[in-house]
Amino acid sequence: LTDASIGYYVDLVPQGLDATQTQALLGFLAYDRATWEAYRKMDGDLSAVEASTTGEELESYRENYRKSQAAGEREVGTARMVVSSVEMQSGSEAVVDACADQTQIKRVSSNGEEIPKPSWQHKYSYLATVRLVDGAWKVASLQETRRLIQRASRLQLLRRSEHL
């Protein structure tokens, strides 16, 4: 699942999934990896994204990709993913509860200069609806559930001060 050659790491997936849940999970991870790789390469090839995404989510991705492409931007760094659950809604739909860590991703211009920290560069949790479409599990929608506070050291200091 992890591919260090492209800086894509899957740190945790749930254990004990049945065959259908596993296929839905693999469909979700195919989407996540494809979108990361497309933003890294920025070569216009969205075939892997199109194979793992459907509906409004695919259109939304294409629009955001075109904006980045027109601006001459691409991404470098490391993407990390944790999946906490895969809940079947029916035989052809699942909801994947995931957490993405994008804090080690940088957006760079065509000449390699870092673009100031984008607003999306954070850790966040979201629910992905994955549907079985023409024999393949594809991401149909993403719903961000919460952003995780990036001030871990500050929180640790606060906790330490509470114990003094």
Residue ranges and their predicted role:
Residues L1, S5-Y9, M88, L158:
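Extended hydrophobic/Leu-rich segments
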Residues D3-E75:
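Core segments of small alpha/beta cavity-forming domains
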Residues D45, V49-S52, A70, A79-V82, ...:
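Short, surface-exposed, charged/polar-biased interaction segments
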Residues A70-N111:
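Surface-exposed, charged secondary-structure patches
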Residues A94-A136, T145-L164:
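Exposed beta-sheet edge and beta->alpha loop/turn motif
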